[in-house]
Amino acid sequence: MRYAIFDESNLERVLKAIGEASPEFRRFRYVELLAKSEKGVVGKYRSLYFLFSKEPFELDVEPIEIFEVEIEKDDGNFRSFRFGKYSLRDKLLLDCNFNEKLFYDYLPALLCEISSARLLIKDCNLRASHLAERESEIVKEITKISEDVKTLSIEKLEELSFEVSALRASFFSSYMLFKDDVEEIFSSIARASSISNFLGGLLKEQIDELRNQLETISYFESRFEQTLSGVRDALDVVHLRLEMLRGKENLELQKRTSALQAAAAVIEFVAVFYYSMKIWEAFLPVTEMPHWLSFSLLAAFTFTVVVYTEALGDYIRERKPSSKLVLLTLTLAILVILMATLPTLFSAASQLSGGH
């Protein structure tokens, strides 16, 4: 007897290979039978299909796996299970009567899970090999980053940050596919173990072997997680260094900006003071006032104008008058009135005293 396990893409070819088959559509606990002919029975378990035949015959499709089964008497080395005894050698030997539930349901379901787990383990090992190669490259890159990060400029660090992010994204996508396979292997082994336990330990040694292989793969999974963590830490170091350099750059820029603003304020003060004085002297008899008073009044006016321009800029930007703007407007108005009236009053007083 033989069980050939295959996927859905080969179903039509297998149905043709078994000759004139009649639809079966029988549902067991795990398996659904689809077709039956003199050559064999085709059934479905989850996403896999199987062909059970009592006599081997040529198939024009490549199955995922083939399991040979033979009915044979116990030679003293068989183990007990639910329906009789078994021994696993180059083929599965069974000492039991033919039972539809065993041969059409429990056994094909168990063999499908074992075959699925083996296929996934093979795929996982290939992925692990590829990831291990990438891991070596990443470790070299991380070591280089750790050595160079303190000496690079902001532009180089930004390039490095992009490269590390791309490296992490590429490794992470491959790792997630690997992790999905590991989870599916775990699920297949768990389902196989459940069926085996129901059958009294049938093929338990095969399941234990799969568990051992899964433990090896889990070691790689843990190692790759540590590598991802290392890449994440390296990226954090690059970002931290970038923030420090940008902070220093911003601080220096703020210092230069503050110096320029102070210089601009001084220049503005001097310009306003000078031109205000010239205009004031041109239209009013400022010389009749005490020098200390004219200087103080002009300085106060100039300072108020400089501060007023800043407050007016805030108003134009926010479209909302502030109390600072109102207070400065009143102060400026009072100073203008004083600058307009005081020279005239002092001039009139001087003329009166001169007349006497």
Swiss-Prot record:
Keywords of this entry: Cell membrane, Membrane, Transmembrane, Transmembrane helix
Membrane topology: Multi-pass membrane protein
UniProt name for this protein: Uncharacterized protein AF_2239
Major location (coarse): membrane
Transmembrane segments: 258-275, 290-312, 325-347
Recorded superkingdom: Archaea
Naturally occurring in which organism (per UniProt): Archaeoglobus fulgidus (strain ATCC 49558 / DSM 4304 / JCM 9628 / NBRC 100126 / VC-16)
GO CC, alphabetical: plasma membrane
Intracellular or extracellular location(s): Cell membrane
